[in-house]
Amino acid sequence: MEINNVISKTQLTINSNKDSLNDIYFKKFSIIIPAYNEEKRIVATLSQICHFISETKFPWEIIISVDGNDGTEEIVKEMMKQFPFLRFIKGNGRNGKGNAIKRAVDIANGSYFIFMDADNSIAFREVLNAVPEIMNNDVVILERYSIAKNQIPFQRELVSRGFNLLVRSTLGIKVRDTQSGYKILKEEYARRAFNSITVTNTFYDVALLYKIRKLGGKIIEKPVIYRHDLESKFNIISEILGQGLSLLAFRMRHSPFYKYIPRKLRDLYYRKFRWI
């Protein structure tokens, strides 16, 4: 198969050695997409990826991890009839983005994982361009803030940058875009990290990177073009409350003072707040 023909179909830009690209693209990848009530967007996102895998015959799979009760499940199941590498798993109710991804990781067959959002805010060709970076790293984050023309809403960017400063100062994670929904990971590090993560809200991104760094994994960021989706769900109050409480609880959990925190207070967080 001519890799250049495949790349031309997906508008992929090559800046690396052709043989190296062939090697990594023919590895087994699991693309994991959490979907909470995404019936309006899931077809456009999935169609491009499914046709790419179908045309290239790469040994990749796609796992859609569904929460919610709209028509997403029916849409995915209908597409599964055409694309045998498309898989589906569903949780009970809304269990949080982190839990949705963990469910998919548990059943994934890949040697590498690609996490993507259902909104297609980062084009699939950007993901494909980043794939070779995983050869010499353990996590590749597709980072949104370095490219000036990326139009990120002020409130979202303000919260993200403030949260990032707190993460850097409290956990020592020197990453600019911890909350990017687009990541490429080596399977061994992802599984080992998820085995010890209990957070299920969007703070799972930070917990995942923290655990992988503790395991000795190498994390890099690759700036990409980002297109903000006007229908993207973002509640500034919920985000600040959820992320702030999660960061505080996570920091305390990994401090020498954890054993002195009353059990009732620990249980309150896990019962009430980790799904925010």
Predicted regions: what is each one?
Residues 14-18, 38-53:
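Short, well-formed alpha-helical segments that are part of the catalytic scaffolds
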Residues 66-74, 120:
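A conserved acidic beta->alpha catalytic loop
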Residues 60, 73-107:
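Conserved donor nucleotide-binding strand/loop of the catalytic core
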Residues 38-41, 68, 97, 123:
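Donor nucleotide-sugar binding loop of glycosyltransferases
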Residues 91-107, 112, 124-202, 229-245:
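Acceptor/aglycone-binding surface of glycosyltransferases and processive sugar-polymer synthases
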Residues 27-33, 42, 49, 60-65:
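Hydrophobic targeting segments
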